C-alpha cells in the first residue's frame, strides 16, 4: 500500500507588508514568496529566492497566513508556477476566503490557475534579457480582474 504525501512547497519567506504594485497598492498584504525561478531577468530584485528556502505544507502556510491577520494574500517568487503544488495552495487560500493574487512572469501556463485568483502577469521587455520567454498566447486567458505588469528599463523597452 502506498501513502500519498501532502503537497509541499519550497518557501523563501512569508511576511506582512503593504502591497506596492498593481491595483492593490497600499493594501495590507501577506506575501508568500516561493523559491525558484527559471528566468534570470537583469533587473530582478528577488534573486535571493532563486535557491534555498524550506519545504512547507499547505496547511502550515495557511496557518502562518492566518496568524498575520490580513485578507489579501499575494503568492509571488521567484516564479510560483514553477512549483506544481502552487495550484493546490492557491485553491486552499481561496477556499479559506482570502483575496488571492498571483505574481507570475508570463513564461508559464496559466491554464491550471484557479479562476478566483487575480493573475498579475509580468510581461518581459527586451531590457529584461528574457523577452523570448514570454508566452503571449497566455494573455488571452486573462480576464477583466487580471493585470499586466511591464517593467520599463530603457527607451528601447518603451518603444518596444
Where are these regions (language model features)?
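Residue-level preference for alpha-helix termini and adjacent loops
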Residues: 13-17, 23, 30, 47-49, ...
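A broad, structure-centric signal for solvent-exposed, well-ordered loop/edge residues
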Residues: 18-21, 25, 41, 51, ...
Amino acid at each position: 500500500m502506498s501513502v500519498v504525501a501532502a503537497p509541499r512547497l519550497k518557501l523563501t519567506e512569508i511576511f506582512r507588508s503593504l502591497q506596492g504594485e498593481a491595483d492593490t497598492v497600499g493594501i495590507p498584504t501577506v506575501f508568500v514568496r516561493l523559491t525558484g525561478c527559471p528566468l534570470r531577468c537583469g533587473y530582478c530584485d528577488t534573486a535571493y529566492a532563486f535557491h534555498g528556502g524550506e519545504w512547507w505544507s499547505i496547511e502550515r502556510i495557511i496557518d502562518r497566513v492566518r496568524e498575520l491577520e490580513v485578507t489579501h494574500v499575494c503568492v509571488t517568487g521567484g516564479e510560483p508556477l514553477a512549483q506544481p503544488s502552487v495550484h493546490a495552495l492557491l485553491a486552499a487560500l481561496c477556499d479559506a476566503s482570502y483575496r488571492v493574487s498571483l505574481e507570475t512572469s508570463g513564461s508559464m501556463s496559466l491554464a491550471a490557475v484557479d479562476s478566483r485568483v487575480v493573475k498579475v502577469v509580468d510581461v518581459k521587455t527586451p531590457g529584461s534579457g528574457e523577452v523570448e520567454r514570454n508566452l503571449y498566447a497566455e494573455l488571452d486567458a486573462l480576464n477583466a480582474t487580471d493585470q499586466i505588469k511591464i517593467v520599463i528599463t530603457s527607451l528601447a523597452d518603451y518603444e518596444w
